[in-house]
């Protein structure tokens, strides 16, 4: 099988992997996932952005720095992630200008997907102080009812 974390067991013998697939499954029928149309496609657009333009830079730089202790053997790779990560943060910051959330007027799973590694981007060497729209958005997400921080 596809032994990955996270994994969601659905029923007795069905399993779902990949965080964004799990989010889409769990959000179906809720306000966190638009029912159809352009807004739903925009949620998917931001989730694909997170997977292909954000996570490969920010999450990998964070892993090398925080969990591996930035070993000399990985320093070049770590430094190579900074430009792409900052490019992703710039795209996000520009999009959030004049907006509270990534899609529509309320939080969606697009916000959840992007929040995950963005709020710990500093652990990968990314300085968020130059991205004030992101900083405001992070605080907005953290003030939502039911917000639960990441377990260390």
Q: What do the predicted segments below correspond to?
A:
Residues 21, 133, 146:
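Residue-level recognition of oxygen-bearing side chains
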Residues 87, 91-95, 140:
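Solvent-exposed, charged/polar functional surfaces in cytosolic regulatory/catalytic domains
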Residues 97-98, 143:
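The C-terminal cap of the DNA-recognition helix in HTH/winged-HTH DNA-binding domains
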Residues 81-88, 137:
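Alpha-helical packing segments of well-folded alpha/beta enzyme cores
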Residues 1-79, 83, 93, 100:
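GST-like domain detector, emphasizing the conserved glutathione-binding G-site
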Residues 150-152:
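Terminal-tail/helix-coil boundary detector
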């Amino acid at each position: 099988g596809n032994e990955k974390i996270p994994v969601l067991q659905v029923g007795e013998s069905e399993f779902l992997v990949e965080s964004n697939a799990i989010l889409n499954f769990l959000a179906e029928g809720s306000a966190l996932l638009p029912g159809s149309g352009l807004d739903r496609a925009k949620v998917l657009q931001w989730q694909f952005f997170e997977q292909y333009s954000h996570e490969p830079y920010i999450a990998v730089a964070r892993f090398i720095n925080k969990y591996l202790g930035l070993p000399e053997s990985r320093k070049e790779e770590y430094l190579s992630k900074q430009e792409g990560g900052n490019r992703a943060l710039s795209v996000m910051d520009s999009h959030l200008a004049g907006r509270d959330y990534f899609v529509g007027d309320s939080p969606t799973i697009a916000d959840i997907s992007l929040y995950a590694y963005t709020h710990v981007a500093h652990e990968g060497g990314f300085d968020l102080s130059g991205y004030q729209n992101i900083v405001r958005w992070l605080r907005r997400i953290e003030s939502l009812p039911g917000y639960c921080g990441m377990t260390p």
